[in-house]
Structures are given as structure tokens and as C-alpha cells.
């Protein structure tokens, strides 16, 4: 972060009290991304407390302005325009999700405002020659690598790959399919569903009918939770079930209880903030 500050210029807004550094971002506080994005907000607040406790960022107190993009791409675009042109933030904080980050990256690129993308993992974001966005997390295509390898180790021969029809889940699914092919596992079903889908009964029955022994679900908190609850209701069981985002969050086992047992998930770091 200090390197980004130095690259952003030496003169922060002189009208701010005591030469404060203003950070700003639009991060989902409501909508489908609120749960994982909330962990991102926690980490930002933790970092600010630690930095200010050490005397600030390069000697300047850090203050933050966090807005709610409501898990909506168009809202995020408008809010980042506002943060840059009206609020005149010194540094930008990245949004959550690959889809929103992909759209917002066009805004910060236009204004030459750098940010580190710590809540987006899809490779296409970094394949367009952009100069002002940086990645620090594993790429989406490798999220299910461990799950597919484990499936191979325990003798699974047929898997289903499902996921929300948005950028990150599609890329995670692409990676899972590639890993399955390398390991000689048969993908008997591939299907993406609308982002707000809540009823997975027909899809789960379709997966079972296809003969899948394991489910690679490229999902977020809400859809993964719904799939697991409905699996239990239908008494549909698989040798392995892996989800990209939901199981790695503390609220997942808290909300699902025993239904979350034996479910695989992914985490970028431990413990979660």
C-alpha cells in the first residue's frame, strides 16, 4: 500500500484535516455478496487501526469512506466515479467479486487511480493490458484444484460442475473442468444457473440422474447453502461436494449446522478477519 501511495503522487488533498489520507471504496454491505464482502471490510478496518496505531501511512492518519454498492455492478460504477470526482479520495479500495471488479477496473483505469484487487480472482480481469489494478489472491481457475485432486484420490470417476452464471463462477468452473480432464475424471454434467436462483431441486435431481458421484459447485454463500439444504431434503447424497466461497466463511457452519458437515470449501488465508 505504501508503494501505491508513493506512486499516486506527493501532494494529498491539502483541505483535509491534519493532512489525512482519505481511502474510499464501494464494497457490498447488502445483496448477495454482503457476507464475504463483510470480511473484506473487517480486514480494511483492521489494517487502518494497525497503521494509525503505528503513526499513520507515511506519517499521515488514514481515514476511510465506505459506500454500499448493493452487490450491483452499475451502482458500483457510479459510486467509484463519485469517490474519484466528487469525494476526491487519495486512494481507492477495491470492490468485492470478479464481476464488479471487472467493471470498476475500467473506471479506475480511466482516472489512473490504482487499487489492489483482493476480492476478485478471475483471470480475464488481468488479461486486458490494464496498468492500475493488481491481484494478490489465487486465480479462479485454481479454486477447485484441490477438490478435483481429492476426488481423484478417493476414486471418484464422474463429477458434475455447476455454478452461478457470473464471471468468477464461470472461470472457476472452467478451471475445474480442465483439472478433471488432466486427471481423467469424466464430467457428466455442466450447468450454470441464474445468480438469484434459490430452488435447485430440479438441478440436483438432474445431477443424480447423470450418475455424478461428486459435485463441484462454483457458488457463493446463499446458493451453496440452498443446495446443501435441498440435498438433505431430497435425501440426495454425493461422495464429495465442494463450493468456492460459502464453506470458508464462519457463518456457514453456524447457519447450516450438521448440514455443513463433510463439505469442502476454499480460503485464501486463515484466520478470516
Sequence positions of predicted segments:
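Extracellular/periplasmic Venus flytrap/periplasmic-binding protein
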Residues: 78, 123-124, 131-235, 273
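Glycine- and acidic-residue-enriched helix-capping/strand-helix junction motifs
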Residues: 32-42, 167-172
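Short helix-capping segments at alpha-helix termini
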Residues: 51-58, 110-113, 180-186, 232-237, ...
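Extracellular/periplasmic periplasmic-binding protein-like sensory domains
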Residues: 228-273
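Bacterial N-terminal signal peptides
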Residues: 1-7
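Structural recognition of the beta-strand scaffold that forms the well-ordered cores
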Residues: 22-26, 63-66, 90-95, 113-119, ...
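Beta-alpha junction/loop-to-helix N-cap segments that form part of ligand/metal-binding clefts
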Residues: 14-22, 35-42, 54-124, 136, ...
Amino acid at each position: 500500500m505504501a508503494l501505491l501511495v508513493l506512486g499516486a503522487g506527493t501532494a494529498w488533498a491539502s483541505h483535509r484535516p491534519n493532512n489525512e489520507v482519505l481511502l474510499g471504496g464501494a464494497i457490498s454491505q447488502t445483496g448477495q455478496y454482503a457476507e464475504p464482502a463483510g470480511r473484506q471490510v473487517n480486514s480494511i478496518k483492521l489494517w487502518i487501526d494497525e497503521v494509525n496505531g503505528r503513526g499513520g501511512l507515511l506519517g499521515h492518519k488514514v481515514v476511510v469512506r465506505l459506500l454500499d454498492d448493493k452487490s450491483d455492478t452499475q451502482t458500483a460504477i457510479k459510486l467509484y466515479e463519485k469517490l474519484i470526482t466528487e469525494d476526491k479520495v487519495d486512494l481507492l479500495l477495491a470492490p468485492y467479486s470478479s464481476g464488479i471488479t471487472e467493471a470498476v477496473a475500467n473506471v479506475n483505469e480511466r482516472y489512473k487511480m490504482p487499487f489492489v484487487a483482493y476480492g476478485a480472482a478471475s483471470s480475464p480481469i488481468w488479461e486486458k493490458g490494464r496498468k492500475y489494478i493488481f491481484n494478490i489472491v489465487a486465480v479462479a481457475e485454481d479454486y477447485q484444484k484441490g477438490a478435483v485432486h481429492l476426488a481423484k484420490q478417493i476414486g471418484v470417476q464422474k463429477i458434475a460442475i455447476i455454478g452461478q452464471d457470473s464471471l468468477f463462477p464461470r472461470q472457476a468452473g472452467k478451471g475445474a473442468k480442465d483439472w478433471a480432464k488432466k486427471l481423467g475424471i469424466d464430467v457428466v454434467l455442466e450447468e450454470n444457473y441464474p445468480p438469484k436462483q434459490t430452488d435447485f431441486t430440479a438441478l440436483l435431481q438432474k445431477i443424480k440422474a447423470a450418475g455424478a458421484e461428486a459435485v463441484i459447485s462454483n457458488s457463493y454463500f446463499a446458493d451453496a447453502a440452498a443446495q446443501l439444504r435441498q440435498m438433505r431434503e431430497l435425501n440426495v447424497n454425493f461422495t464429495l461436494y465442494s463450493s468456492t466461497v460459502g464453506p470458508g466463511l464462519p457463518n456457514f457452519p453456524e447457519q447450516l449446522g450438521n448440514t455443513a458437515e463433510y463439505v469442502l470449501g476454499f480460503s485464501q488465508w486463515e484466520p478470516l478477519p
